[in-house]
Every structure is written in C-alpha cells, then in structure tokens.
C-alpha cells in the first residue's frame, strides 16, 4: 500500500485488512508523509508484529516507483501472491479475498479489481476522475488490443512469477500510466489476466 499523507485512513485500512478471514501481510511504502502516516504504522507494528512492515522513502517519488519498491521487497521475501491497493478505501478491502481466490484457485496470473465490469464499481471518486479513467482505459484497449476493460486499475493481485518475469527496472512510467504498463507487460508475456 503506497502512502503519502494518509494519516486519516492508514490505521483504518490496516485494521480492516487484518480483520479479513485470510491471513495477509501488509507493506506500507511511505514517501515521507509530513502528516505522521509512517509514525502511525510504526506504532501499529507493535500490535501486529511480523505481519506489518514499512518501507520509508525520502520525498514523493511517484506512485509507480512506490509499487516497484514494494514489488521488489515482496519478491525478496518470497511471497507467492502480491497485491497492490490504495490506502484511501477507493478499493474495498473485502475484495482482497476475491482477488486472491481468482489467482490461487482459478489459475489466473493477474487478477484485476476492475471498476468497469458488471460487478465492478467506483467508490469515493468524483465524476471527472471516473470519465478520465474510463476514457484512458478505452483508448489503451483501442491502441494495444489488450483484453482489459480497466487498464488503470490499481487494485491487483499478481502471482510472484509475473513480477519476476517482468523486468521491473525497465518499467518506464512512474505515474498512473504505470498501471497500464504493468498489465500490458504481463499480457505480452503470456500471463492470464482476469477482471
């Protein structure tokens, strides 16, 4: 979970994830939040022990680089399933179970929490952001023929093998286009994606 000034949400999102039926570990990648986000996480580490980790970075370096740092950390720790999600509850933590089951039980390599399929929805977003995101996904599908309706989705479960195959050091985008590039590279490498 990448963070920058998420003091309002961070404890709630951590507690919610840890309340789920499945056992999850959480890595917070904090980009030097001046609001005390990292301090809240460190305090919660006393309660959650070896399930909660923090990677503190100096200054705001971009969403994509935060995810890449988290992915590299997760690969070294040998996690089989690696998730990405936001801290602001724009992704429903209850759906982590659905993403996990899709990869673990259904043989999918990349499970995408899509906002633009029949059962998907958008939470806590203004209308203009929805239009921009949907338009970007439509444009990407037209250009690449990638069979993903929500190319900019940031709620994803990857098998570790996908992240090991993609050369994370060659990812070019550090902003929201990072989401598109990751899905495209997974698809081009022959991995199975499901929304």
List each model region and its residues.
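Residue-level signature of catalytic and energy-coupling elements of molecular machines
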Residues: 10, 17, 70, 88, ...
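Acceptor/aglycone-binding surface of glycosyltransferases and processive sugar-polymer synthases
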Residues: 57-76, 81, 93-176
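Catalytic donor-sugar/metal-binding loop of nucleotide-sugar-dependent glycosyltransferases
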Residues: 147, 170-174, 183-195
């Amino acid at each position: 979970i990448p963070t920058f000034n998420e003091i309002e949400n961070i404890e709630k999102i951590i507690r919610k994830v840890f309340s789920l039926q499945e056992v999850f570990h959480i890595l917070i990648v904090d980009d030097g939040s001046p609001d005390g986000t990292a301090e809240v996480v460190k305090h919660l580490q006393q309660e959650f022990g070896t399930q909660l980790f923090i990677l503190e970075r100096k200054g705001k370096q971009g969403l994509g680089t935060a995810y890449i740092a988290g992915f590299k950390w997760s690969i070294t720790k040998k996690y089989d399933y690696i998730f990405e999600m936001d801290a602001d509850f724009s992704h429903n933590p209850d759906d982590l179970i659905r993403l996990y089951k899709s990869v673990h039980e259904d043989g999918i390599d990349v499970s995408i929490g899509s906002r633009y399929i029949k059962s998907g929805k958008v939470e806590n977003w203004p209308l203009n952001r929805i239009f921009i995101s949907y338009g970007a996904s439509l444009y990407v599908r037209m250009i690449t023929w990638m069979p993903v309706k929500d190319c900019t989705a940031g709620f994803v479960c990857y098998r570790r093998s996908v992240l090991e195959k993609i050369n994370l050091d060659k990812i070019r985008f550090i902003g929201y286009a990072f989401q598109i590039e990751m899905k495209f590279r997974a698809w081009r490498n022959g991995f199975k994606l499901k929304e």
